[in-house]
Curated annotation (Swiss-Prot):
Protein name: Calmin
Biased composition (Polar residues): 500-509, 835-846, 898-910
Organism: Homo sapiens
Tissue expression as described in the entry: Widely expressed at intermediate level.
Entry's transmembrane regions: 977-997
Main location, first listed in the record: membrane
GO cellular component, one term: nuclear outer membrane
Top-rank taxon, per record: Eukaryota
Amino acid sequence: MAAHEWDWFQREELIGQISDIRVQNLQVERENVQKRTFTRWINLHLEKCNPPLEVKDLFVDIQDGKILMALLEVLSGRNLLHEYKSSSHRIFRLNNIAKALKFLEDSNVKLVSIDAAEIADGNPSLVLGLIWNIILFFQIKELTGNLSRNSPSSSLSPGSGGTDSDSSFPPTPTAERSVAISVKDQRKAIKALLAWVQRKTRKYGVAVQDFAGSWRSGLAFLAVIKAIDPSLVDMKQALENSTRENLEKAFSIAQDALHIPRLLEPEDIMVDTPDEQSIMTYVAQFLERFPELEAEDIFDSDKEVPIESTFVRIKETPSEQESKVFVLTENGERTYTVNHETSHPPPSKVFVCDKPESMKEFRLDGVSSHALSDSSTEFMHQIIDQVLQGGPGKTSDISEPSPESSILSSRKENGRSNSLPIKKTVHFEADTYKDPFCSKNLSLCFEGSPRVAKESLRQDGHVLAVEVAEEKEQKQESSKIPESSSDKVAGDIFLVEGTNNNSQSSSCNGALESTARHDEESHSLSPPGENTVMADSFQIKVNLMTVEALEEGDYFEAIPLKASKFNSDLIDFASTSQAFNKVPSPHETKPDEDAEAFENHAEKLGKRSIKSAHKKKDSPEPQVKMDKHEPHQDSGEEAEGCPSAPEETPVDKKPEVHEKAKRKSTRPHYEEEGEDDDLQGVGEELSSSPPSSCVSLETLGSHSEEGLDFKPSPPLSKVSVIPHDLFYFPHYEVPLAAVLEAYVEDPEDLKNEEMDLEEPEGYMPDLDSREEEADGSQSSSSSSVPGESLPSASDQVLYLSRGGVGTTPASEPAPLAPHEDHQQRETKENDPMDSHQSQESPNLENIANPLEENVTKESISSKKKEKRKHVDHVESSLFVAPGSVQSSDDLEEDSSDYSIPSRTSHSDSSIYLRRHTHRSSESDHFSYVQLRNAADLDDRRNRILTRKANSSGEAMSLGSHSPQSDSLTQLVQQPDMMYFILFLWLLVYCLLLFPQLDVSRL
């Protein structure tokens, strides 16, 4: 056993000796490489001495201190050799070395564990460590000092200060702090040099991670040389050459062409672990000889890398929505290609075409409005300015496709607008827009073309984008024409349209908004008069499509259900549409134009009104403008329909208008106006001005919003096409609770709505008086909105949207006609009901009559049946433009009416209103977007119903009239279910939100 143990010890000892030998060999090899490199480097500088000096054996020649003092003199420019004393005695040598070391310490060169005795004895590791510190301080640190201020910080791990030099710095109690500072300075300088190399080489596909293995192939050296002079190196050929060939070629080219001394040999690099200090010493020469190369880097990004991508985050929108701006340098000019990208299932179809689109040549017909100009740079710069500055209307020139710029200019115009999803241009409508013009089956175009348009847009997003922009331009111009008159009409449009347009117009039509302002300023373009209908650019397209469709009788099919927006639009449009009523015939093309102008202006005004509304809750001016302008078109009718002063309510009140006006007074006088005017113009406008149908269904109700008539209005059958972003996106700036509460009506609102339920009967007596007005205004109301042609245009409008949803609010007294024809007939047949609804707004004061409420409920039930029939008919035909989204206020109204609003995501390019039973939301859960929407809607609806049930118990009574309300009330009565739904919603929201967080920016 002893023999075996002895053998084991011998074997272990032998292994240890072999390991020591290997380490020693590596150390010797490294010392040899460093010695050779440092010797060459020292000789480069000693050549400058007079007389020149030369180092043959570094470890021997440095022992007397003369070489060291001469080197420091050259590097620092100070005179040190005069202190040198030549002598063979050790004491004098130590004195010379000590003077040199003292000079280094005075120069803030940290020397740890290096003393004169070790240098005088020629200790290899300490001598090399001393020389390395001199190189690092006098060359690398000085050269990288400027780079560190300009170059981006590199996240790459810096190379170590050097094995030998580090080993020569054993920390001592007295020098511990100095060691830390020295190591920190070393790493900082090395890191700066590495960052410089990376910037030079990355453009050629060479990844330099350190100053060791990354240089072994020789490609890094070649890349640095190519960065200095691209003509010297062929990187493709280098990839085929061997490592030795690349290294030899690199060192040779650097010496011959760049006059960089050859400090290294291929053998020095072709090892497993090349010496970092030697490589850094050599590479630093490139930076020393070509310091101007760093300044050129500023331009290299443009020259070498033609495309820079910049992400412009739109805070108002979900993090999913980001605009990618590609900056292309073309002939010194910058053009911008803007793609609005979203992660929502339906890809957004908004494309800002590379082709600059100028609106110089506008054909209101929109058939051929493609006036492309080369002002793309200016236009795109303006777009970027809007994105950066957030100025919605900074590009107000008609010649510029502001709608597109508005894509990026989706801004925080309102807190609400921020919360609303940013609408993208109804890209599919571009095709449909042309289709209606090309084919007169606008109903077909409107119904079928949107999908085709969507596909075609997907296929030809660029062309469509151009078309869309041009159509928008046309619409803007047309909107400008009516805006002179519609500026005031838009006042009313502001509120409702503002609510929906808060999201849409603010987001998509920042430019339109600007153009709207500009348009308002350009009141003289043409009298909005008869043919001028102000329409949002998005809806303009829809209107264009719906123009003939309405004429064909598919009015509701062509009606985009931007109910919230369009209630105001319809009221304003009702007044404007009266002009159409006066001249219905020219509207096939002009109605489109008018619809475009009206919707554009309405959307613009809506945006501004939204802005002002969120800013202030009182601003009668825009409404006054509407009153002025609407009377300009239909002053008489609106004088009757809009007698209430609330329209004069300052725009500052518009926020309340969005929330409360829609809740409370959406009907009051603006319904009167909208209904009277709309009823009058319905028959006429239906054929003549499909834009009216395109005008949001809420237009009738928008006057009260704008009028801010806070009298409790009769129960509104409010349709809300809810963008799913409203739910699961608190928009980061708005607390989730605030977003949820935004859809819950206050107790006062609930009471008002309850009183509204009571109102209908109270309105009934007034209806008698109002019937006359309604009779006079049936044509206008019907023209403004077929569904709204019924007495309470807002009810019908909401109901239409609800009809689209498939729920008839129990509170709605008047049946909604799916078709304008049918509605016109109904408006005439239901004149008492029309006047009843129209009088609901005037008779807000009569809210408190419970008997009236009972009578109203009965009438409502019968009317609901009729409306349901109409709705069923409408549902098949109704098409919702992607932009058609109601504001949260509309949502509140919808929930108050116990109707389940159809969920439309703003990103959906084609959305059809669906009749939703409580089961529809369940089916929607199968898609993650619909799941979130359904959860949100159910939660909010349940909460609202619960509050209503608690406050008045009417929810149950109303629920008895509608099976949906029954199920909802039953669901509401189960708090556990409500909390469970809320929990699920929050869970889904978190799961969907987390993947979209930009963790890289944290």
